[in-house]
Design a protein with these regions (language model features):
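Short acidic active-site motifs
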Residues: 44-49, 83
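Short glycine-rich anion-binding loops that position phosphate/pyrophosphate groups of nucleotides
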Residues: 13-15, 63-65, 78
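Ser/Thr/Gly-rich flexible loops in soluble cytosolic domains mediating phosphotransfer, phosphorylation
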Residues: 73-101
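Conserved active-site segments centered on acidic
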Residues: 2-43
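Proline-aspartate-enriched helix->loop->beta-strand connector
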Residues: 54-55
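Glycine/Thr-rich phosphate-binding loops of Rossmann-like dinucleotide-binding domains
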Residues: 67-68, 82
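Short, polar loop motifs at secondary-structure junctions
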Residues: 44, 58-65
């Protein structure tokens, strides 16, 4: 495992759901003994925040378009809890495949 994976967590307003999703990801990372760092922001600022934080992946709890230059996961399961474990598996598998965490 390499450096911590930088995860940009985004939603429509960058308030409650962003914080909830980030905390859930941090807790799951600790449980799996994977190093991550989370950054938070608004979907409207997507391109600016990706350029500023240079994340390894994005978890968005609001709708956004796929970007060819970065992996984007839907974070809706972190809020609804439906499919949450599957999302964790996808995210942490991706992190491992990138040699991060």
């Amino acid at each position: 495992m390499g450096r911590p994976a930088v995860i940009l967590v985004m939603c429509g307003s960058s308030v409650a759901t962003t914080n909830l999703a980030a905390v859930k990801l941090e807790n799951e990372a600790k449980r799996r003994k994977v190093k991550i760092e989370t950054r938070k922001g608004k979907i409207a600022d997507f391109d600016t925040l990706v350029e500023r934080h240079k994340p390894d992946l994005v978890v968005a709890t609001a709708q956004t378009h796929e970007r060819p230059h970065i992996k984007v996961f839907s974070g809706v399961p972190l809020i609804s809890t439906i499919g949450q474990e599957e999302l964790y598996n996808q995210i942490f598998t991706y992190i491992a495949e990138q040699g991060l965490g």
